[in-house]
């Protein structure tokens, strides 16, 4: 074996926990919409790491989020108060890699909140935004648990520095890097729209189809199988009010057999489509163990009494993060927070919530 105890997972974890957007948002700006075609054309012309964009030669297994990990990745630019609390909780569980262009400023900010830098490493590489869960690398194993490798997709935003962060991380970790960046393996994808059970079942919204119009669904499935070991790829219609169409905004795998699914009041906002998607999954698929999926519901919180179909921002409790024995859950200083935390605690006994 080699590298199996390095950085078991090298992407992560930020929640949309405040209403005001700072710096680049998680969606594409109007300018970026115009830039996207030329950004994608870039990947027809050259590789990011000057290596062949081919899948691993051995079978691949992408780990589930609840498996043991030794590190998480944070891009430090927006929402520093939230990031500091993530670091505070995460550094007790694993090493925290912080991408920043101003290490001392981050250290000073952490220290001002009584957070030291024990178990914290700094990555000095260019980046564009805070959304590391979406642009960061994915960790997988060849031959089940043998060699740790890094998988990198084409990021679905025209933010080239963000898109290069996985290359930098693979270099720091000294892991083989496999990129879906050149035909016939070109694939545009984003971390917030993918989750898996560690046994070859993956979930996404149909955004994965919409953002790869030159590929058939079968071709997308083949790429995910070759690069990530996904042998069963479950896809669901996008939601009308979730502008970024990431499944982590309304869904969370808690283990191989349990789905945490957001729930709106009947008929409100994305509620009808969420219910339809949930019925599609439970009526057509069992867990990897052949058992029906257990479904736990969690409220989709209102923003000052309003939901996304009126004037409310898109608040969610499903966009959480496993970090070994801890799970970090977004909260909003509203009454539903206590209900959401109780649901997580009941569903995950033994975890720090």
Language-model features and meaning:
Residues 1-23:
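Bacterial Sec-dependent N-terminal signal peptides
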Residues 21-353:
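The feature marks the mature, well-folded catalytic cores of soluble enzymes
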């Amino acid at each position: 074996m080699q590298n199996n105890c390095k950085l078991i997972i090298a992407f992560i974890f930020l929640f949309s926990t405040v209403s005001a957007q700072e710096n680049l948002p998680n969606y594409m700006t109007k300018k970026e919409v115009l830039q996207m075609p030329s950004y994608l054309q870039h990947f027809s012309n050259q590789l990011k790491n000057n290596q062949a964009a081919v899948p691993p030669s051995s079978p691949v297994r992408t780990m589930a989020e609840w498996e043991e990990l030794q590190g998480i990745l944070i891009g430090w630019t927006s929402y520093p108060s939230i990031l500091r609390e993530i670091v505070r909780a995460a550094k007790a569980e694993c090493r925290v890699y912080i991408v920043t262009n101003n290490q001392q400023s981050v250290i000073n900010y952490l220290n001002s909140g009584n957070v030291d830098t024990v178990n914290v490493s700094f990555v000095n590489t260019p980046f564009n935004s805070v959304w590391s869960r979406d642009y960061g690398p994915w960790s997988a194993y060849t031959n089940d648990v043998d060699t740790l490798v890094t998988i990198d997709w084409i990021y679905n935003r025209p933010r080239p520095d963000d898109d290069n962060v996985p290359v930098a991380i693979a270099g720091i970790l000294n892991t083989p890097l496999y990129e879906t960046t050149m035909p016939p393996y070109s694939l545009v994808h984003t971390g917030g729209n993918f989750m898996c059970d560690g046994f070859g079942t993956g979930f996404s919204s149909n955004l994965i189809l919409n953002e790869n119009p030159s590929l058939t669904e079968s071709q997308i499935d083949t790429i995910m199988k070759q690069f990530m070991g996904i042998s069963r790829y479950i896809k669901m219609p996008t939601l009308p009010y979730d502008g970024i169409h990431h499944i982590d905004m309304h869904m969370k795998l808690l283990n191989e057999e349990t789905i945490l699914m957001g729930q709106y009041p009947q008929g409100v906002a994305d509620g009808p489509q969420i219910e339809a998607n949930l019925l599609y999954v439970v009526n057509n698929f069992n867990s990897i163990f052949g058992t029906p999926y257990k479904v736990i519901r969690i409220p989709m919180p209102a923003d000052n009494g309003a939901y996304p179909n009126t004037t409310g921002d898109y608040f969610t409790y499903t966009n959480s993060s496993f970090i070994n024995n801890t799970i970090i859950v977004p909260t909003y200083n509203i009454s539903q927070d206590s209900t959401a935390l109780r649901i997580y605690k009941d569903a995950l006994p033994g975890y720090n919530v």
